[in-house]
Amino acid sequence: MPTILERIMLAKQKELEIQKSAVPIATIEDQIRDMEIPLNFSGALFGDRIRLIAEVKKASPSKGLLMAEFDPVDLSKTYVDNGAAAISVLTDSRFQGHPSHLKSVKTITSSTRIPVLRKDFIFDPYQIYETRILGADAMLLIVSVLSQKQLIGLMELARALWIQVLVEVHNEEELKQALDAGAEIIGINNRDLQTFETNLSTTERLSPLIPENKVIVSESGIHNRKDIQRIMKAGAHAALIGEALTSAHDV
């Protein structure tokens, strides 16, 4: 039986073929020429305290609906007003996300100079051009769903389009792949994408293996101040938090 991740990737491939037919890549390339240079995502994550990447997320494959009354603009405004260093937007349909959510969020963040990360399952160059036209300042690449050749190629294209890349890893082997590919921002996912179980010890185990000149982001399984202190002690510069915020009664 296919894993959750395998089912997601199969569905994404089908969706992408439809999208490519509807909007040819040449059309997107023409629109990119007149766009402004994206904001500095990695620069927003440095400081004397741990930084928050707050996630705009309606649902998750593991827990289902997180917010019944979901407004990406209102939610991102709340995040910005409360000191988020960056905003992450889920654009994948499995999270009840949509690319339009990111464009909507940019209407709030552009004036405040807060960068926006596109979080999706990206594996094709077309998706990077799409990411740029949506206005994202950074995007996620997940090592476990890419070959090393794919990872390097997608990172090079993103760099050419001025998009910074958060490269997500879950174990030592994936971390080596990310570093070998030249990743500057490493996302340590505390969630195992095969089982969807979380454990903060993943950040504690992998963080010491990352060179000091890299930006470390701890992702998933972060619910309270104690968790923040734990990952900060491990060496994380930023925490990406979604479910704990979107499922809270008072964000």
Positions of predicted regions on the chain:
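Alpha-helix-loop-beta-strand connector modules within alpha/beta enzyme cores
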Residues: 36-43, 47-48, 96-121, 143-144, ...
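Glycine-enriched alpha-helix->loop->beta-strand junction motifs that scaffold or abut catalytic
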Residues: 83-84, 108-112, 133-139, 159-163, ...
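Catalytic cores of alpha/beta
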Residues: 123-135, 170-182, 218-241
